[in-house]
Amino acid sequence: MSFYDEIELEDFTFDAGTNLYTFPCPCGDRFEISLEDLQLGEDVARCPSCSLIVRVIYDEDEFMEVDNDASTAPIIIAA
């Protein structure tokens, strides 16, 4: 896979309404990567208008999803 560039996530803009991080693309549109993609360990942002892609540099540990599954929670029994 050939990347146009490598860009730090902190240089992207986050839109809380769409949960997308975006960064300007040379074609005039914007590279996009979703919060969900980052939580899944993805590091590729794509431009929807052209074929360019960039590698997103970020700390994956900051985006790890916390498992709030009740089935793994401890059960407290009151006597």
Swiss-Prot record:
Q: Which reaction does it catalyse?
A: [3Fe-4S](1+)-[protein] + Fe(2+)-[Dph3] = [3Fe-4S](0)-[protein] + Fe(3+)-[Dph3]; 2 [3Fe-4S](0)-[protein] + 2 Fe(2+)-[Dph3] + NADH = 2 [4Fe-4S](1+)-[protein] + 2 [Dph3] + NAD(+) + H(+)
Q: Does the keyword Nucleus apply?
A: yes
The cofactor named in the record is:
Fe(2+)
Lineage top rank: taxon: Eukaryota
Q: Which GO terms describe its molecular function?
A: ferrous iron binding; iron chaperone activity; oxidoreductase activity
Q: Which segments constitute the DPH-type MB domain?
A: 3-59
Q: Which amino acid positions bind Fe cation, per UniProt?
A: C25, C27, C47, C50
Similarity section: Belongs to the DPH3 family.
Q: What does this protein do?
A: Required for the first step of diphthamide biosynthesis, a post-translational modification of histidine which occurs in elongation factor 2. Dph1 and dph2 transfer a 3-amino-3-carboxypropyl (ACP) group from S-adenosyl-L-methionine (SAM) to a histidine residue, the reaction is assisted by a reduction system comprising dph3 and a NADH-dependent reductase, predominantly cbr1. Acts as an electron donor to reduce the Fe-S cluster in dph1-dph2 keeping the [4Fe-4S] clusters in the active and reduced state.
Report what the protein is called: Diphthamide biosynthesis protein 3
List the source organism: Schizosaccharomyces pombe (strain 972 / ATCC 24843)
The encoding gene is: dph3
